[in-house]
Each structure stands twice: as C-alpha cells, then as structure tokens.
Amino acid sequence: SIYHVYNMTAVAAVAKLYHIDDQVLANVLATHIVKNGRMEHFQLGDRSMFLNLAKNPVGANMTLRIMNGMNEEKELLFVLNDNIADGLDVSWIWDINFSVFQQVTRVITSGTRAYDIAVRIKCSGYSQDQIVVLPDLDAAIQELNAHPGKKFIISNYTATQPTRNALIHWISKNGGNVNEYNH
C-alpha cells in the first residue's frame, strides 16, 4: 500500500542522512517483509484474503481504496474492538468513507463492537440484507470463507492478532497458507 511506500521513503532518507552505503539500503528494501496485519495475505483453501490493521479512519479508508482498485466481487470482514489499548471511543468509525464500496457483495462484522460497525455501514447506505453480524471471530472467519470472491479484513489494534490467529487456526485445520510479501 501507499503507507509502505511512505515508510520505505523514510528509511531511504534516513540512510542517506547517515551516509549508509547504497548497497546496504538496497538490500534492506529488497528483503523487507510486510507482515502482522499490514495487507497480509492469507490463502484459506481457494479463498484469497487480505488482513489490514486500521486504527483510524485514514487506515480504514486506505484499505477500502485498495479494495476498490480490484475490479471483481469481494467481501469485507470488519473486526472492531473497544479494549483499552484501542481507546474505548470508537466514534472514529463515523469518519470512514464507506460510500466508496464498489462490487462489495457482503460485509461481515465481528468483535466487541460488531453491532456498532454494522450500524455505521448500514447508515452509509449499504443494504442491511448484505450485512452479517457475528461477534464471534471464528464464526465470522468461517462465514467469510463460505462464499467465492476476494476477501478483505479490516481490524483495529486489539482485533488484529486474534484475527491473524483465527486465520492461521483455520488454515491449520482446513488447508491454505500465509504469504508474507517482500516490499
């Protein structure tokens, strides 16, 4: 995503500032692996899923833009918690631009605030018939994998690791893999 470009640009600028050898910099950039919920790719059976951490509207909007860049049917799982590390206030979800949904056939919501994010998505004009609320994460992963199409998962801070673990658990039982991309 564009954030990886920003981060790598910052790395290059600091390397130049401290006169780090160009070959060392090139090696670092070539071997950097994106993981832990940063557009991390999972293959659950024949279903391709991307997990992205979003701690604020900007992060969520970036994932939605990436989704829209893929011209095919897709589904979204949004996992929202309100634990102390997340900040108990989830009002930031009202600043997410859900009006950009294109070819999103279904949205599943999960987490401790699954109903809040479902209401937010419904208020953006998305059909209630296409929103599935499953606070239980394992049930949400199972439901997400039940239909064809590309899958995207947005999770906030404390939801990301449990979501990753649920995906890996599903893979260990049913087949698939985790693909860490070099960027």
Q: Locations of the language-model features?
A:
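ATP-dependent carboxylate-amine ligase
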Residues: A13-I20, N27-H183
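Membrane-embedded hairpin module used as a gating/binding unit in multi-pass transport
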Residues: S1-H19
